Amino acid sequence: MTNKVRTRFAPSPTGYMHVGNLRTALYAYLIAKHDNGDFILRIEDTDQERLVEGALDVIYNTLKITGLSHDEGPDIGGPVGPYVQSERRNIYIEYAEKLIEKGEAYYCFCSKERLDMLRANSEALKRPFRYDKHCIDLSKEEIDKKIAEGVPYVIRQKNPTTGSTSFHDEIYGDISVDNSELDDMILIKSDGLPTYNFANVVDDHLMGITHVVRGSEYLSSSPKYNRLYEAFGWDVPIYVHCPPIMKDEHHKLSKRNGDASFEDLMAKGYLKEAILNYIALLGWNPGGEKEVFSMEELIEAFNYRNINKAPAVFDTKKLKWMNGEYIRALSLDKFHEMALPYYEEALTRDLDTKKISELLHTRVEVLNEIPEQLDFFNNLLEYSPEMYIHKKMKTTYENSLKSLEEVLPKLEALENWTFENIKEVCMNLVKELEVKNGVVLWPIRTAVSGKQFTPGGAFEIADILGKEETLERIKIGIDKLKALQ
């Protein structure tokens, strides 16, 4: 391999694309592309019991949707494949046997019952479980005999019990661990497949990975990974361990707890660009005031040394704000195209949806807010006459009734029902009555919508509703106000 930067995203196909996983993929992609490097997709499927049908498609689809295009991977191949761990079984066994020859690993024939007993003892003593090296000194004859008899075995890493192991992480700095704390972790399981802990080290080396990006929960395993690199005489890659993403101060974001996955956020009407932009800022500080970044700007600005150690809190309000910024930056045509499925779901009347898009474009932060903004277009909602009283607009029951009674015949006489003509009629009435705009416009808006807050005002709503429906609703408003007399 050359000195080219090479990063990898190595998910397990176990279901949804969690926000934390997507951030790992994004950071790995940005590190590679910042230096014109390669971004590799590797599928880590050695834990066969956790695999979920269709999860592989979720991984491919997410990378495709987000534009985090990999340069090598199972679907497109590359020079260091296969890129699926279950297809690399023989490679891991070969390297595990090399460790045995070097005296850095050993066969373990301990039964499940014995290991369960050791675990129970550790729990009773409130100590972390560590294998007791029971099989470390078996002779070659004993090992050969047990293998010949078909006794199940695993291959374990042989860690020292004295001294310490140190490693450097770009975010957390230099970390040193007493070797007495290192468990002789399993490298090859009894089914012949490697553990994640072994496979990721072998694959990262053979695939020429220069920067390993992963969650900070792997910090505690890194000394054992380093001992594997040293045992093989391999260079240790640059470690970039990212802080956890928290739901709040005390709870990690977790799909198991019903927290949003990438698919959930997309289904709620968040734009992929906004999601990526927001996730990039969960733990990374670009410096300065700028918060909205295109992918090209992220690639240029991203420096992994500016990732914080402190956990990042997933702030839905901040994500909504950012999504609103992205929605407002869309062209009207693009927004209309994205809003159409929501109109089809929410509207029961045949209305000019392009005009509705003109109203909503700057008024929604998330696309799934659209239906709740449209309810009054289908049917006039039941509302209290008290809505006609508005202190700021200086409206009362009396002047509201007068405004509606005065505007009704003028709108009835209107032959060409357009926004401009409706506006002209209403503004002429304001002059004629010598009142503030709100005295005429607030009652009309209340009558046609039945709501305190609407996208657009009286003219826009009347234009979209059409003449017949608008007049009908104004008459209902007049009746409501007359009933109070």
Curated annotation (Swiss-Prot):
Binding site for ATP: 255
Catalytic activity field: tRNA(Glu) + L-glutamate + ATP = L-glutamyl-tRNA(Glu) + AMP + diphosphate
GO cellular component, one term: cytosol
Family matches, as InterPro entries: aa-tRNA-synth_I_cd-bd, aa-tRNA-synth_I_codon-bd_sub2, aa-tRNA-synth_I_CS, aa_tRNA-synth_I_cd-bd_sf, Glu-tRNA-ligase_bac/mito, Glu/Gln-tRNA-synth, Glu/Gln-tRNA-synth_Ib_cat-dom, GluQ/Sye
EC number: 6.1.1.17
Details of cofactor binding: Binds 1 zinc ion per subunit.
Binding site for Zn(2+): 108, 110, 135, 137
Keywords from the UniProt entry: Aminoacyl-tRNA synthetase, ATP-binding, Cytoplasm, Ligase, Metal-binding, Nucleotide-binding, Protein biosynthesis, Zinc
Gene Ontology MF annotations: ATP binding; glutamate-tRNA ligase activity; glutamine-tRNA ligase activity; tRNA binding; zinc ion binding
Compartment list: Cytoplasm
Family annotation (Gene3D superfamilies): 1.10.10.350, HUPs
'KMSKS' region (motif): residue ranges: 252-256
GO terms, biological process: glutaminyl-tRNA aminoacylation; glutamyl-tRNA aminoacylation
Enzyme superclass (EC): ligase
CDD domains noted in UniProt: GluRS_core (cd00808)
Keyword Cytoplasm: yes
Family to which the UniProt record says this protein belongs: Belongs to the class-I aminoacyl-tRNA synthetase family. Glutamate--tRNA ligase type 1 subfamily.
Function: Catalyzes the attachment of glutamate to tRNA(Glu) in a two-step reaction: glutamate is first activated by ATP to form Glu-AMP and then transferred to the acceptor end of tRNA(Glu).
NCBIfam families attached to this UniProt entry: gltX_bact
Description of how the protein assembles with itself and partners: Monomer.
HAMAP family: Glu_tRNA_synth_type1 (MF_00022)
The protein's name: Glutamate--tRNA ligase
